[in-house]
Amino acid sequence: MAIQHKKGGGHRGRGSKTGRSRGRKFETSRLKDVREDESSGEEEDVDVQPAEDMNDSEGTDVSSESGLDEPPKENSYSTLLKLLNTDAKSNEPARKKRKIKANEPDANLVEVSIPTADDIEQMDEVADTEASASEDENMDDEGLPGEDYAEDIGTDGRNDMFELHFGNPDETELSQKIQACSKAWKSTKADLIDGLYSVVSMPDVEGNSSAIPEACWSVRLLTYRQLKQKLARNTVSFDRLNSCLTPYIFGYHDTFFCSRTTQNSAKLRDLYCLHALNHVLKTRDRVIKNSAILSREDNGDVELRDQGFTRPKVLIILPTRQACVRVINSFTKIYPMEQQENKKRFMDSFSAADSDEWAHKPDDFKELFGGNDDDMFRLGLKFTRKSLKFFSKFYSSDIILASPLGLRTAIEKEGGKKNENDFLSSIEMVIVDHADALIMQNWDHVEYIFSNLNLQPKEAHGCDFSRVRQWYLDGHGKFLRQTLVFSAFNTPELNALYNTQMQNVFGKAKIMSKYEGAMLNLRLPISVKQTFSRFDSASPLKDPEARFQYFTRTVLASLARGWTESSSRKKSGGTLIFIPSYLDFVRVRNHFANSSQTENISFGLISEYTSVRDSSRARSHFMNGRHSVLLYTERAHHFRRYNIRGVTNIVMYGLPDNPIFWGDLIEYLGSAAGGTATPTVRVLFSKWDALKLERIAGTARVRSMLLEKGGDTFTFV
């Protein structure tokens, strides 16, 4: 199957060159006749193009043998429980509880228990005592774990979510949960911190609680519940956000976090990198420990199932090569390695310096496109006791990092006769970071990758089936896989992923924000009239047609009355028509080119496929008055962030997904503040735009705007 690549490595948002076509020439723009020189106001932008070629995941494989690191000798978590129980029996005041209420009554709203300062101090004292023990004391002469390793995997395994989830899940309970996944899930909602709230869902099985996990307020407490000690040595301290997310992530819940920002992205990255490393090291230690046990057994009666079909366990999906570099930096910060093979090759092909020409760009743009913004890559990482190998073969890798396009090209082979997806058959953790950016690339690639996860392999690849976990053999790998998705906002595509692909039997959590509304945070020297017009739409499939009919019959008809052949720019002003979808953009463009309704309107256009030169010319003509109307797509703004001048009116054919874009577009009106025309904004929306509308108008207003029966027009000044 041919790949529809909407966004490629070195040409962000560009389209292919067009040749001459037969018959009537298609009219893509219309200019007013003026005497000024055509190039007088033209603006040229320079688009930085990454020239790095894709590096495949090929490389020389090395031995998979690795050493072990040993946990402390004593059962520290039991000691901690005894300490807390002793405190509860004392005469000291009981732990404080704070009930957090939502704006509206909710029967499922729960109480969140916040540890006091004394509680946290006591936890840390216990942790400090245990942290002084050396892991090497529990290693035997061969570098294998000593008898005290049983603490991690044996007697206290009930306290370790890794063991409960992947080690020894109850087969009867697991079967009941898998059957319940196809039915309705029960959910619990609760407020968290800083305007965040969570919805935790669990398969509806008797005795299966959907209670909100208690926050982990101490990294040391996490260490002795879930974390390998060697990772805790370099772990950053927890802030309030990490404390709230840790129980979901380290509890192996599927987690969809919808409030990623440039301020919290680094800490989120450190958190999921810590979790991924912890999972890989625990998996490796269990396999080597069991191999040592089997080597000492004379008979074959011992059955130890601790593996999948193939070695890769963690898949991290990222938008750019530079994002991959940041993840690697987090890995090496948390888990410093004595040897890093092929590190120079990795840095040469993945890392690049930021462009000085983007100094004026917003922070979210620089975070996404700074450095090497190539979106065609894939990389295998292999961990041993003392080394990290870059560019390892996928079947020898522990962690795979890739862009959606890069991984899809690895799965698909020429001719499409056979897909190479066996290396994804035993993935136990999928991390999708900056998911909102992946939507702007090509979300079809992400959906394709998820459709190829946890399938039965077509070849053995040297697998020892006597050690493959039973639920892998039964084809239930997807029900125990943990999926973590981090996005700046929620979209229908991400909701569909959450509902269809995140089927973890241990539950899932969606963490969202309450929005004040982007329309309230404008930085303009003048007041702007913002009018929201609601139109009726029977279904999402019929929404594009209903939107187009409303636009042409109502909005465009009223605007066209001011656009005549003799009308001046001062009277009508420059109108920017913002169109989120490229398919809608093509339809509106064709209408402007061929309809008698717009035959007297001079217009230009900028889409993600418009070249930099043509975009600069269109902006220049619009600023100088040769274009009365400029058609502009959301993906063009996402990839270019143009500063468009001469805008006095804005018509939004649809709301932008990214609320940051609302402020960018409205601030265009500030460049024309000295004109005689009064700036206006007209927005079209339907009930299917609820997620977008909430981010723009605010959580408190969205319900009334969608359900109000007294009128379909809402004006804000």
Curated annotation (Swiss-Prot):
One of its GO terms (cellular component) is nucleolus. Residues 1-147 are annotated as: Disordered. It comes from the Eukaryota. Keywords: Nucleus, Ribonucleoprotein, Ribosome biogenesis, rRNA processing. The keyword Phosphoprotein does not apply. One of its GO terms (biological process) is maturation of SSU-rRNA from tricistronic rRNA transcript (SSU-rRNA, 5.8S rRNA, LSU-rRNA). Residues 24-38 have a biased composition (Basic and acidic residues). SUPFAM superfamilies: P-loop containing nucleoside triphosphate hydrolases. One of its GO terms (molecular function) is rRNA binding. Its main location: nucleus. InterPro entries: P-loop_NTPase, UTP25, UTP25_C, UTP25_NTPase-like. Residues 1-23 have a biased composition (Basic residues). Residues 118-147 have a biased composition (Acidic residues). It is found in: Nucleus, Nucleolus. Pfam families: Utp25_C, UTP25_NTPase-like. Component of the ribosomal small subunit (SSU) processome composed of at least 40 protein subunits and snoRNA U3. DEAD-box RNA helicase-like protein required for pre-18S rRNA processing, specifically at sites A0, A1, and A2. Belongs to the UTP25 family. This is U3 small nucleolar RNA-associated protein 25. It comes from Arthroderma benhamiae (strain ATCC MYA-4681 / CBS 112371).
